[in-house]
């Protein structure tokens, strides 16, 4: 009779484990491993190439998200320094205009007409405001008019998002100016970090309530990043970098147009241009080569067939030249009416 000592038991376990391991990996010892009716194989069958691709996609997605969050955090940290510098400059500017007028100092200010209009507009909104949260919301409408257009991309924006992946944040640098204006109007220029966060939370609730009324139309959706393919690897990388900054295809079109036709928008000559020549209505056709670049960047990102994407892209170009929403100041009365309610 075999006496099972501890040593014998350990040896038996090792032998059984090795035998089981060889049984599993040796197809000649177990022919049914190749049988498709084998339950475990059906349940756990994995194609190695497909698995590798999936893992690569997950890894890339994780890396992109990590990179995005890192960049957002860096921007937020930089914005804090910007806030302190901007506030000092703003207070000095306000002291300066107590002894003179904006008209007197305007010649020494770069882009003085735009600066003068901006200051006049935001001052009017501030004077009409009765509530800090409503003032912030109105200034968001004023400073980010393109986010509140027909594509309703504001749905994806928050001041203090719970998730930096699901929602984007408004430009922290513009938010700094809004914060300074609110502190001047309601808190005697005192820095109120905790109060500002509470106001931001209240404004986010207002944005959520407004978002519930709208959806982003399917024609403005963008493809998932992994499905975007350009004509080359370099093109694909460049397009993805552009798309990372956008919520909708309309926003992508606008971003590309502002880069390619910067001079037209800066000078105001954009009003005379459209996608095609239109002699009857007095419009000049845009540069064909630049328009081809717009199509090459935008169309691969749209979740529709290329012929349809081309038509939609053309419509979005014309729409933007008819009313370029990035130009602020057009909705001043709307903002004043909002804070006055």
From Swiss-Prot:
It holds the Pfam family BEN. InterPro entries: BEN_domain, Poxvirus_E5R. GO terms for molecular function: DNA binding. The keyword NADP does not apply. It is a single-pass membrane protein. It comes from the Viruses. Residues 112-222, 233-328 form the BEN domain. The chain crosses the membrane at residues 7-25. GO terms for biological process: symbiont-mediated suppression of host innate immune response. Disulfide bonds: none annotated. Interacts with host CGAS; this interaction inhibits CGAS-mediated type I interferon response. This is Protein OPG067. It comes from Vaccinia virus (strain Western Reserve).
């Amino acid at each position: 009779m075999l006496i099972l000592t501890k040593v014998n038991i350990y040896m038996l376990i090792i032998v059984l484990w090795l035998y089981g391991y060889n049984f599993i990996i040796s197809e000649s010892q177990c022919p049914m491993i190749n049988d498709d009716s084998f339950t475990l194989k059906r349940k756990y069958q994995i194609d190695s190439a497909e698995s590798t691709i999936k893992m690569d996609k997950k890894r890339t997605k994780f890396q992109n998200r990590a990179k995005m969050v890192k960049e957002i955090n860096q921007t937020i940290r930089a914005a804090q320094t910007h806030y302190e510098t901007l506030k000092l400059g703003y207070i000095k500017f306000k002291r300066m205009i107590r002894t003179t007028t904006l008209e007197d100092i305007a010649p020494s200010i770069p882009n003085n007409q735009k600066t003068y209009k901006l200051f006049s507009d935001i001052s009017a909104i501030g004077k009409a405001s009765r509530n800090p949260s409503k003032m912030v919301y109105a200034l968001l409408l004023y400073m980010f008019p393109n986010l509140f257009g027909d594509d309703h991309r504001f749905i994806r924006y928050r001041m203090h998002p719970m998730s930096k992946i699901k929602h984007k944040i408004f430009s922290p640098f513009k938010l700094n100016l809004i914060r300074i204006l609110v502190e001047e109007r309601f808190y005697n220029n005192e820095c109120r970090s905790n109060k500002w966060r509470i106001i931001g939370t209240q404004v986010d609730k207002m944005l959520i309530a407004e978002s519930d009324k709208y959806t982003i139309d399917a024609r403005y959706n963008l493809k998932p990043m992994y499905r975007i393919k350009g004509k080359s690897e370099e093109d694909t990388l460049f397009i993805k970098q552009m798309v990372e900054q956008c919520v909708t295809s309309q926003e992508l079109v606008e971003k590309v147009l502002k880069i390619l036709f910067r001079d037209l928008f800066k000078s105001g000559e954009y009003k005379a241009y459209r996608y095609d020549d239109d002699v009857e209505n007095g419009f000049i056709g845009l540069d064909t080569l630049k328009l081809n670049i717009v199509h090459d960047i935008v169309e691969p990102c749209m979740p529709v067939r290329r012929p349809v994407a081309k038509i939609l892209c053309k419509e979005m170009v014309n729409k933007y030249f008819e009313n370029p929403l990035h130009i602020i100041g057009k909705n001043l009365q709307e903002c004043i009416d909002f804070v006055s309610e």
